[in-house]
Each structure stands twice: as structure tokens, then as C-alpha cells.
């Protein structure tokens, strides 16, 4: 079996950290780089969180690239709303105390350009069909890369995005999911580009839930990584207990996206062509594009069912492996 190259595009909140850990624990892929975006935190915080968690998990050599610091149409850098800090903590990783990495993200000393987009295009040209790209935040970096070099981006073997909601309500408005709503223009550009991708949205991520009982062993491991991740996720579960107690734990949004990138058989998907509403009360909603309903070539696979027991078993096994 050929090991695929993996790039994660993260807005480094708590579930992003779990997705990163899942990727590191997965022998099917080689994590070659991380690109960062605004979202759960400002992009600079996202990058430094990535570096700190990589160091914590024994992978400090993985490069981290600074990406988009704002939505495509914004004139000022993005600042997360106060509600986001309640979910992910002020530092984005549940307030957990994780030692800072001695390294800096690529692009930290540059005032021009977007290091993440530069890297993504170079990686697409280098690895082509052997590259897997997973975006777990706003799609700003992907949209910019498609605009700059569509041919390179079309050559990537697999693209998976965590975001959207097709058959269930949104989580920031009646119709919109947070990642898509953070930069609707970017999401719409990606979904209309023709680039084939799999959308892992709220339709399935709210069906894979982690409980306090599930993470009890992380603290019991006695490792720094286990204790840090337990602290992060305890905060995250607490936010769900306040805002969505009916779930019984926290949704594993981003880890599921990484898992599906590795093993697409975890989900059942509907092929369709998507767009994003850009105006009015439904701004940020992902929906089938009425103008392309009869187009036989479907650019998106939307995950609508998930083998939750199998995924949760894999998640617990891999997290135990990486957290000690």
C-alpha cells in the first residue's frame, strides 16, 4: 500500500487538535505539512497552536505555514467572536497549558503573500494524485490556491472539507455551519470550481460524539500529551453540555474529516453540485446548485451517513496510540 502525503489546513481549535493527533497516529498517511487559517482563533494563534501540539506529540519537524488572516472580501484581519472562546477557550485549545514550540511558522517574518497558498500549490505540483488535503476551517486558502493555479489544485488526489450542512440545521444560524459562514465567498468559489471533494458536515459529525468517560484514560496515561488533551477536551465537552446537551458529549467534527480522507468507506455520500448562499438570512448555507441539478458530473460527495461505531473505535485506538 502506497502511503499518501497529507496536508491539513487548520484553524486550530480543540477538534482541530484531535484531528492533528489522529493524523499523526495514522500509518496510512504521511503528514508533510500544515497550513493555517483564521477561524476558531486568529491565524497567528492557529499557527502557534499547531507548532505547540506538534511538539507535544513528538513531531516538531512538520512545517507549519501561515495562511489567510481574513475572509476573501474583508479589509481587516479576522477576530473571532466571544462565543468562539466559550467553545474552544481563549487560546483555542481549551485553555490547556501546552509549552510553546521553539519554532516559528513559515511566513511569520513576511508581510506579503500567503505562505500557506504558496506551499499548497508547490505540494500539489510535487505530489499530484498522491496528495490528500483536508481543510477543517474556512476555505479561504483553498479558494486562493484554486484562483492562482487551478490546474495544480485539480491534480490533488483527494480533497476533504469539514463544513456545511445539507440535511440538518446549521450551528451558527438556521442554515449555516460555522466554517462555511466564516468565508461564504471562499466556500462558494471552491464548490463551484469543479474541484472534486468530499464534504463532511454536520449531517454526520453530530453523530460521532466523544464523552467524558471516553477521555478518562487520557489523564490516566500519565503522559504530558494525555493530560493536555484531556484538559482541552474537558473544556470542549463543557461547552457542548451548555449549548447542545442532547448530544451527550462533543462532536468530533474535524477528526471525522481526517478519518474519511483516510478511509472513505466510513461514510455514505450523495453526489451533487453545491453552492453557498451569499445574501440574506441564509448567507453561508450550503445547498444543491439548482442550475446544475441535471449535470451528470457531480463535483461534491456529501457525507450523509456514517458508521459511527467503527469510527469511534478507530478514534479511541489511534488517540491511545499517540497520547501514550
Predicted regions and their residues:
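Active-site histidine-anchored catalytic micro-motif
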Residues: 2-52, 60, 95-206, 212
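Conformational coupling and interaction surfaces
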Residues: 2-3, 22-23, 30, 181-185, ...
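Histidine-centered active-site/metal-ligand motif
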Residues: 16, 88-90, 141, 253
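Short, glycine/acidic-enriched capping/hinge loops at junctions between secondary-structure elements
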Residues: 18-20, 46, 75-77, 172, ...
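Acidic/polar N-terminal loop/beta-strand segments that form early-domain functional surfaces
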Residues: 36-39, 67-69, 279
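Metal-dependent C-N hydrolase catalytic cores
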Residues: 47-126, 298-307, 311-314, 320
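A residue-level signal for conserved active-site and pocket-lining positions in enzyme catalytic cores
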Residues: 64, 190, 258
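Short, surface-exposed amphipathic charged segments that create phosphate/polyanion-binding patches used
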Residues: 78-86, 173-177, 215
Amino acid at each position: 500500500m502506497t502511503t499518501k502525503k497529507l496536508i491539513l489546513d487548520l484553524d486550530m481549535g480543540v477538534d482541530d487538535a484531535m484531528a492533528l493527533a489522529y493524523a499523526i497516529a495514522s500509518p496510512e498517511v504521511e503528514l508533510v505539512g500544515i497550513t493555517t487559517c483564521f477561524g476558531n482563533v486568529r491565524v497567528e494563534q492557529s499557527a502557534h497552536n499547531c507548532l505547540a501540539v506538534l511538539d507535544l506529540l513528538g513531531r516538531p519537524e512538520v512545517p507549519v505555514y501561515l495562511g489567510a488572516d481574513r475572509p476573501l472580501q474583508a479589509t481587516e484581519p479576522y477576530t473571532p467572536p466571544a462565543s468562539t472562546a466559550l467553545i474552544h477557550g481563549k487560546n483555542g485549545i481549551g485553555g490547556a497549558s501546552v509549552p510553546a514550540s521553539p519554532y516559528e511558522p513559515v511566513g511569520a517574518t513576511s508581510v506579503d503573500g500567503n505562505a500557506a497558498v504558496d506551499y499548497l500549490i508547490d505540494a500539489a505540483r510535487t505530489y499530484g494524485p498522491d496528495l490528500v488535503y483536508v481543510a477543517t476551517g474556512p476555505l479561504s486558502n483553498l479558494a486562493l490556491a484554486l484562483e492562482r493555479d487551478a490546474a495544480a489544485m485539480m491534480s490533488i488526489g483527494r480533497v476533504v472539507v469539514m463544513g456545511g450542512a445539507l440535511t440538518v440545521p446549521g450551528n451558527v444560524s438556521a442554515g449555516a455551519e460555522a466554517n462555511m459562514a466564516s468565508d461564504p465567498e471562499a466556500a462558494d468559489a471552491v464548490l463551484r470550481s469543479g474541484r472534486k471533494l468530499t464534504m463532511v458536515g454536520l449531517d454526520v459529525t453530530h453523530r460521532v460524539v466523544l464523552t467524558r468517560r471516553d477521555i478518562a484514560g487520557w489523564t490516566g496515561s500519565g503522559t504530558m500529551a494525555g493530560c493536555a488533551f484531556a484538559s482541552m477536551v474537558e473544556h470542549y465537552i463543557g461547552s457542548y453540555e451548555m449549548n447542545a446537551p442532547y448530544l451527550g458529549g462533543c462532536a468530533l467534527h474535524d477528526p471525522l474529516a481526517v478519518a474519511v480522507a483516510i478511509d472513505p468507506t466510513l461514510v455514505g455520500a450523495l453526489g451533487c453540485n453545491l453552492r453557498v448562499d451569499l445574501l440574506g438570512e441564509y448567507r453561508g448555507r450550503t445547498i444543491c446548485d439548482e442550475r446544475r441539478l441535471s449535470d451528470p458530473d457531480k463535483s461534491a460527495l456529501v457525507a450523509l451517513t456514517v458508521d459511527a461505531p467503527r469510527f469511534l473505535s478507530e478514534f479511541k485506538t489511534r488517540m491511545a496510540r499517540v497520547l501514550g
